[in-house]
Amino acid sequence: MLTKQKFWINDMEAITCIMFILIVIGTINICSASLITAYTNFENPYFFLIRHLISLLIGFVAFALTSRFNYKKLKNCSLMLTVITILCLSAVLLVGVTVNGSRRWLSLGFMQFQPSEIAKIVTIIISASYLGQCIDKKIPITVNPQKNIIFLLCLIIAGFVEAQPDMGTALIIIGIPTIMYFIAGLSKKWIGIICGIGFILLTLLATFQPYRLDRINSWYDPWSRSQEDGYQIVQSILAIGSGGFSGMGLGHGFSKYSYLPESHTDFAFAVFCQEIGFMGAFIVFLLLIALAFYCIKIALRTKDNFGKMLVCGITLLIVGQATGNMAMVIGIVPVVGVPLPFISYGGTSLILNMISIGLVLSVDRHNHIIKKSTKNETITTPPIKYLSKKKHLYRLK
């Protein structure tokens, strides 16, 4: 009798394979997109590729260690991680490396390090720890600073990042915990208040910082400013459009020849579309969707609420960055400087993304261990139910 064969042995292997495929695609694209910029600035066409490979090696080691690490230990060191993150972000403002008017990096001699990337995952960890505890103990979820200092810490961290300035990353740092709070059961009233205050702050920032208002105007009508603020968006759209269905061929795109700024970082996807075409872009899109799908599967079956919320946050991080970057390069949203996970050049971003995936695997692995250890035991644990929907509404079940 024939037995049904599974394409994937398990979800962890599926996630690992998808991540490796995306990394291979990203490495090839970085090699092609960065050649001209690297040769022009450093007289070495493989300058960025070599640094990317070094980061990739560090990322592989970090991924392997993190996937075996017991994620539950993160709850005990969340305060330490928060303090280290704030100290690093403070150091950036004092002695950080300035590039294109933004001070976002710390120099380690042989490489540069971007603390705001760590801030993304740290805010997810501390938020997941608080939310998991609230769900376990059936405590009402709130963002009131008198009852919950965690959300305030996320705001402080986002404020440090915004001061660099880096609005795109700051929005991610505060946006993802907000969605996590909503998933865990924060009332719609609080969500509305957060969104309202956020809108007012964004309006004030755009009003008092003219370059941001110019960026919004250039996004609204980039073609009338094609030689000014709208130049980058126009060149990105032209690059994507010129790729057609099958692309110009790997290495044959012309936008990387100093036409498209940041062609190997924030706008690497535009170069990829030009050289590989719609077909390649669609494959990357499907891979990211598949990655999110398997992460959601793990979140749904995870019994530990801290692990569940941690996987939710990491999934939101990957999906949010991918959506923001793709929308940015085709002109749907203003330029916000958000990288495409595993595709855009960025050593710290790559390492932290691999660590994030390692944490997802850690959650699934350790919950499988618990499941196996209790397989032959009779457990009568009632499902989570809340008496008041206004206080508790655990939306992810």
PLM features: residue spans?
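Transmembrane helix boundary and interhelical junction motifs in multipass membrane proteins
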Residues: 166-171, 248-253, 263-265, 282, ...
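TM-adjacent membrane-interface loops and short helices in multi-pass inner/ER membrane proteins
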Residues: 218, 222-265, 269, 276-280
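Hydrophobic alpha-helical transmembrane segments of multi-pass inner membrane proteins, especially
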Residues: 20-24, 29-32, 39-232, 270-328, ...
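Glycine/serine-rich anion-binding loops at beta->alpha junctions
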Residues: 110-119, 163-165, 244-249, 338-352
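A juxtamembrane structural motif centered on a specific transmembrane helix
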Residues: 1-3, 326-397
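Transmembrane-helix terminus/interface motifs of multi-pass secondary transporters
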Residues: 35-36, 263, 267, 319, ...
